[in-house]
Amino acid sequence: MESLPGQIDKSLDEASLSLRAGSLRTITHILLPLLRPAILSALIYSFVRAITTVSAIVFLVTPDTRVATAYILNRVEDGEYGVAIAYGSILIVVMLAIIFIFDWLIGESRTSRSKAKNQA
């Protein structure tokens, strides 16, 4: 995500300045729509990373709380592979659903940009 702002064509910023648009308007109408896919990708990466991390969650829950990934590992250790596979499959489906929602949102931004380009 660090390199994306450097990839945005400087002529967009110059055009905004020549049209006397303020900094806030330039950010909200030019930069943020272009950065939206990168921001959503970073959110997806962070979400997947957070879901799969057990150690950080240990500090946030009580001893009675069951974390899905820890529960799956306990089922494997106890030899209950069927239960572990079922819970793992559910976890994968939930994560994929959230990723597809983010992908759909990114697709919407691509579609709206191409529509705007065709109208111009």
Curated annotation (Swiss-Prot):
Ranges of the Periplasmic topological domain = 60-81
Q: Which residues lie on this side of the membrane: Cytoplasmic?
A: 1-38, 103-120
The record's keywords, sorted A to Z, are: Cell inner membrane, Cell membrane, Membrane, Transmembrane, Transmembrane helix
The record ties this protein, via CDD domains, to:
TM_PBP2
- Every copy of the ABC transmembrane type-1 domain together lies at 1-102
Cell compartment(s), UniProt: Cell inner membrane
List GO terms (cellular component aspect): plasma membrane
Tell me the GO BP annotations in alphabetical order.
transmembrane transport
Q: Which residues cross the membrane?
A: 39-59, 82-102
Q: How does it sit in the membrane?
A: Multi-pass membrane protein
Q: Which Pfam families match?
A: BPD_transp_1
PROSITE patterns xref list: ABC_TM1 (PS50928)
Q: What does this protein do?
A: A severely truncated paralog of the AfuB uptake protein, homologous only to the last 20% of the intact protein in Actinobacillus.
Q: Which PANTHER family match?
A: POLYGALACTURONAN_RHAMNOGALACTURONAN TRANSPORT SYSTEM PERMEASE PROTEIN YTEP, PROTEIN LPLB
User: What family is this?
Assistant: Belongs to the binding-protein-dependent transport system permease family. FbpB subfamily.
Q: What is this protein called?
A: Putative ferric transport system permease-like protein AfuB
The gene name on file is afuB
